Amino acid sequence: MSATPSTLVWAAAADPDLHAFADDPFWLILLKAVAVFAFLLLMTLFAIVFERKVVAKMQQRVGPNRHGPRGWLQSLADGAKLMLKEDLIPVLADKPIFILAPIVSAVPAFLAFAVIPFGPEVSIFGERTTLQLADLPVSVLYLLAAASLGVYGLILSGWSSGSTYPLLGSLRSAAQIISYEVAMGLAFVAVFIYAGTLSTSGIVAGQSGRWYIVLVPSFVLYCISMVGETNRTPFDLPEAEGELVGGFHTEYSSIKFAFFFLAEYINMVTVSAIATTLFLGGWQPPPIPGLSGLNSGWVPLIWFVLKLLAFLFFFIWLRGTLPRLRYDQFMSFGWKVLIPVGLVWVLAVATFRVYQKHVDDRTPWLVGFGVVVGILLIVALIDPGGARHQRELEEAEQRKLAEAPSLDRIPWPPPPQAAGRGRPAVSAGASANGSSTVIPADPGPRQER
């Protein structure tokens, strides 16, 4: 996740707005890389306990309260426990790939944070630098690529385990990432068309005084896609406990399992930071009169963390309130709703952007159109009680009954009124708990109609 000076010099040469990164000495780049790494680890430890406490509150439970003040060190205790547990490798596993898969899953989560701006220019040990590890002329594309690399770790873990359930979980994960990566990419396209730049620092600077929350459909599209991207409820199909035991990490234990756990929560922090950067102004304060002065020095870092925590609460809120979707519903929603809406919205943003550039400022029209498309998207999501799906099931059942041959069926267990017909039921003996096994009477040969 570190950036070399040559990379920064190349980026500065490609884009004059990035010249500040080329002036950073190597020790400062290394210091910022270590700070980003430590920030992600601390946010992961916090998010684990925060989630357990919030879900416990929603379920009227106490939650963790043993380790540390009010239980806030519970995640440290869990990490120590996982590191001390026995590390088991299945006999049928492909050992090199089995060991490498958790690392492949965790590393891309750190990489994406390299281009996230935490704050404006500050002074660190006398050196003026931006609170951002690095920036590129194509930072948004870098974010999209880094976010999609983690799926390789999930696929390798399922394939190398030598077990059926992990393999099914990894296949689900691949299909899920492919489906929702397209919708996420369409949300990104609308943002950088509207902003006119692919640089994350340029996008944040363009939101001074107004956030890109006006791109309502892109924001809704991204919020749904980021939940699917991180395999969180209600889109946690690759690790569905009731169907696949533990999913792709069923055969993992000890520190390898901890790596998957770490990757999941760092991905949550990363996609939350991307949403903050692209739609909520990044480190910029809210566009409220009186707060415009709180956008210099180290104060913007607080705004950034607060927005990050709001998105983490959004993840936890979804987990505590929504059930898991069925696999066919999940894939149908991605391909039939999200992607078409994203394509229409990108076309609308591009049209208005060209019209705005060559005619006059039509931002109010763009905002109004965004609100309309956002309302249509929300209406498309609403299916009270699954009524449409229930109708489809009933119609399918009626078709089956209509196509089935008309035969007399013997109900099981037999109804009480049929007890006197034919031979009486015979008891085959009592079981260990005192119950008896009943052999039904022979109804005799069936007569064809």
Swiss-Prot record:
Predominant location category: membrane
Annotated membrane topology: Multi-pass membrane protein
A GO molecular-function annotation: NADH dehydrogenase activity
EC number(s) on file: 7.1.1.-
Pfam families: NADHdh
Region (Disordered): 393-449
Reactions catalysed, as given in the entry: a quinone + NADH + 5 H(+)(in) = a quinol + NAD(+) + 4 H(+)(out)
One GO BP: aerobic respiration
Keyword field contains Lyase: no
Swiss-Prot/TrEMBL keywords: Cell membrane, Membrane, NAD, Quinone, Translocase, Transmembrane, Transmembrane helix, Ubiquinone
GO CC field: plasma membrane
Superkingdom of origin organism: Bacteria
Compartments in which it is found: Cell membrane
Bias kind Basic and acidic residues: ranges: 393-402
Bilayer-spanning residue ranges: 29-49, 96-116, 136-156, 177-197, 211-231, 259-279, 298-318, 330-350, 365-385
Function: NDH-1 shuttles electrons from NADH, via FMN and iron-sulfur (Fe-S) centers, to quinones in the respiratory chain. The immediate electron acceptor for the enzyme in this species is believed to be ubiquinone. Couples the redox reaction to proton translocation (for every two electrons transferred, four hydrogen ions are translocated across the cytoplasmic membrane), and thus conserves the redox energy in a proton gradient. This subunit may bind ubiquinone.
NCBIfam families according to UniProt: PRK06076.1-2, PRK06076.1-4
Family the UniProt entry places it in: Belongs to the complex I subunit 1 family.
Subunit structure comment from the entry: NDH-1 is composed of 14 different subunits. Subunits NuoA, H, J, K, L, M, N constitute the membrane sector of the complex.
Protein's recorded name: NADH-quinone oxidoreductase subunit H
